């Protein structure tokens, strides 16, 4: 809603409401208690094995409400913008049920030799071959191992207020200058109330898989039988029968986190004959506090707080070489605060006899990610064409990684070993980017609407972490060295069509395998997880019916490319995912 009060003043109100259900069905096959025998080039013998078959059904309701009120006016020649906003988001995850069935453990004595073999000639699609005896035991009518039900509710509330004032007509260094300054305050609270109960008593463990309508799911990978698994609808039908219903509360994953941010800024825009210079400074003050419970014990409350101030100067220069060529340069400081999920005091820690601690916990002592950034580029604007080439560099402090650490202090407690999030030491990222766009308007109609677009980025990034025996250096997290995007499209009249080829090289996903209890002293390439290179083809179509109404149709990952994760080298599988091709259609109407 927009309203003009007079020639100088207007007000507006924006409202957003969004609600949707996210339903997930998870079937999991897990082979544990493993012991291998002889190991060959593409396989290894199985001398001991056990099978778990787990089914989880989850229905989560997400709801978002946002109100934004604001206005613009002139006050003594200053163009003034005022805005107030309030938002509320809720994740209601109160429909969660999980059952795990477990086989007996068998070994070479039971099987009369090896119980089978794993084969991994194709490292992306490993397989399993079992003897007939092993199949009869592992895929028999299994007993329930555990029944679990979850109820959780996460509430996220944010209130913000800002005021910005702008005025031109100033002179600095004999150059026309526009001055802008402002203030912003943001207060956010996030609360989590998560409850879970697991039942593994004799009555539950006497239940058989055959009582849950087991079925074998179709599965595309050779050497893998997927199931039998319980019918998820029968799980929901039995909710509350074994747990006694939702009349309980625990605090294991409960938390309350608050973050208040106050910011002031001042900037000036100077208009030279052939250049535009924008210089400014921003000061942000952050107050953070969080509360949680150790291992769900309401009498063992953990609290933490942190306050810090960040000063961010910036300088941006745009220089016009001629009517078609621009050189841009910028240097600035930037801040990224730790996410609540990394800093929350959700903890499962124990005190040892020597007074030290061990366990898993968020890290409220995390410092914010800080970066000094430099960009330099040249741009060319032709008739129906565009090209740019640029260099960028980032000097980063306090990059955040998940990691198991040893002999460290977090929130005033000394840990022999802790799975948490840590700040690394210095990180560096630099690279080059090339963009090219060309309309093919020299072609005859109707082909003059065709265009070609290309983007190529080459990046090098590293992080370092001090350990007792020196410094470990590794690639910057989630950063591919090579990324490219090539598109051919058609944009004319009512049609906007694009076919894109997107490619990226491997990148570091995270440090160390949680299950291997690798601490920072043991880091090497063999226990660092990487995401393999990926290429996909996407198609996008937009059609404008009239000035108000348009439709769109998208196809993503047309060739059904998988995602592959590995430890150190591509022949050591961590995870292999097939997502398929995604189709979407939408309608947009502008009032």
Annotate each PLM feature.
Residues 7-8, 72, 76-81, 115, ...:
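Short loop/turn motifs that connect adjacent beta-strands in outer-membrane beta-barrel proteins
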Residues 49-66, 249-261, 306, 335-396, ...:
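Outer-membrane beta-barrel signature, preferentially recognizing the C-terminal barrel domain
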Residues 44-48, 109-146, 193-254, 406-420, ...:
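Flexible glycine-rich, low-complexity coil/linker segments exposed to the extracellular/periplasmic environment
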Residues 17-21, 75, 86-92, 153, ...:
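Transmembrane beta-strands of outer-membrane beta-barrel pores
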Residues 450, 503-518, 542-591:
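C-terminal beta-signal and adjacent terminal beta-strands/loops
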Residues 1-35, 52, 60-70, 76, ...:
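Transmembrane beta-barrel wall of Gram-negative outer-membrane proteins
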Residues 393-396, 405-407, 411-513:
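Gram-negative outer-membrane beta-barrel transporters
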Residues 189-191, 287, 319, 323-374, ...:
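Surface-exposed extracellular loop regions of Gram-negative outer-membrane beta-barrel proteins
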């Amino acid at each position: 809603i927009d309203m003009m009060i007079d020639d100088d003043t207007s007000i507006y109100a924006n409202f957003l409401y969004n609600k949707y259900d996210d339903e997930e069905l998870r079937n999991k096959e897990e082979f544990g208690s493993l012991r291998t025998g002889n190991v060959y080039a593409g396989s290894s013998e199985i001398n001991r094995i056990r099978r778990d078959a787990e089914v989880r059904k989850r229905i989560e309701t997400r709801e978002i409400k946002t109100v934004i009120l604001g206005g613009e006016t002139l006050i003594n020649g200053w163009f003034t913008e005022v805005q107030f906003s309030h938002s509320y988001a809720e994740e209601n995850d109160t429909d969660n049920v999980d059952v795990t069935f477990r086989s007996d453990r068998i070994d070479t004595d039971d099987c009369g030799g090896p119980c089978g073999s794993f084969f991994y000639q194709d490292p992306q699609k490993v397989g399993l071959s079992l003897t007939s005896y092993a199949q009869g035991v592992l895929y028999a009518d299994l007993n329930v191992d555990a029944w679990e039900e979850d109820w959780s509710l996460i509430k996220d509330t944010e209130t913000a207020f800002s005021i910005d004032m702008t005025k031109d007509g100033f002179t600095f260094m004999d150059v026309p200058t526009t001055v802008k300054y402002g203030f912003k305050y943001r207060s956010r609270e996030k609360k989590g109330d998560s409850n879970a109960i697991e039942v593994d008593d004799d009555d539950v463990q006497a239940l058989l898989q055959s009582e849950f309508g087991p079925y074998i799911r179709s599965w595309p990978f050779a050497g893998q039988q997927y199931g039998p698994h319980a019918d998820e609808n029968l799980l929901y039908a039995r909710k509350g029968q074994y747990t006694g219903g939702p009349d309980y509360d625990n605090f294991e994953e409960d938390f309350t986190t608050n973050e208040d941010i106050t910011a002031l800024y001042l900037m000036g825009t100077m208009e030279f004959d052939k250049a535009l210079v924008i210089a400014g400074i921003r000061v942000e003050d952050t107050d953070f506090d969080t509360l949680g419970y150790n291992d769900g014990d309401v009498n063992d409350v953990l609290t933490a707080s942190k306050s810090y101030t960040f000063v961010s100067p910036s300088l941006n220069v745009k220089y016009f070489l001629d009517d078609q060529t621009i050189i841009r340069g910028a240097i600035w400081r930037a801040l990224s605060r730790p996410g609540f999920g990394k800093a929350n005091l959700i903890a499962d820690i124990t005190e040892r006899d020597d007074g030290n601690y061990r366990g898993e916990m968020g890290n409220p002592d995390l410092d914010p990610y800080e970066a000094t950034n430099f960009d330099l580029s040249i741009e060319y604007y032709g008739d129906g064409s565009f090209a740019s080439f640029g260099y960028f560099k980032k000097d980063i402090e306090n990059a955040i990684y998940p990691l198991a650490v040893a002999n460290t202090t977090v929130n005033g407690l000394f840990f022999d070993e802790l799975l948490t999030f840590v700040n690394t030491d210095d990180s560096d990222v630099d690279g080059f980017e090339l963009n090219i766009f060309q309309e093919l308007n020299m072609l005859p109609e109707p082909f003059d609407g065709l265009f070609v677009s290309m983007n190529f980025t080459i990046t090098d990034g590293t992080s370092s972490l001090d350990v007792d025996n020196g410094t470990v250096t590794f690639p910057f997290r989630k950063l591919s060295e090579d990324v490219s995007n090539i598109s051919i499209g058609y944009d004319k009249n009512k049609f906007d069509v694009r076919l894109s080829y997107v490619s990226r090289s491997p990148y570091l996903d995270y440090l160390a395998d949680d299950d291997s209890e690798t601490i920072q002293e043991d880091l090497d390439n063999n226990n660092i997880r990487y995401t393999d290179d990926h290429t996909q083809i996407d198609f996008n179509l937009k059609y404008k019916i009239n000035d108000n109404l348009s439709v769109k149709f998208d196809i993503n990952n047309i060739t059904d490319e998988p995602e592959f994760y590995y430890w150190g080298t591509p022949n050591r599988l961590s995870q292999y995912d097939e997502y398929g091709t995604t189709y979407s259609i939408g309608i947009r109407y502008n009032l």
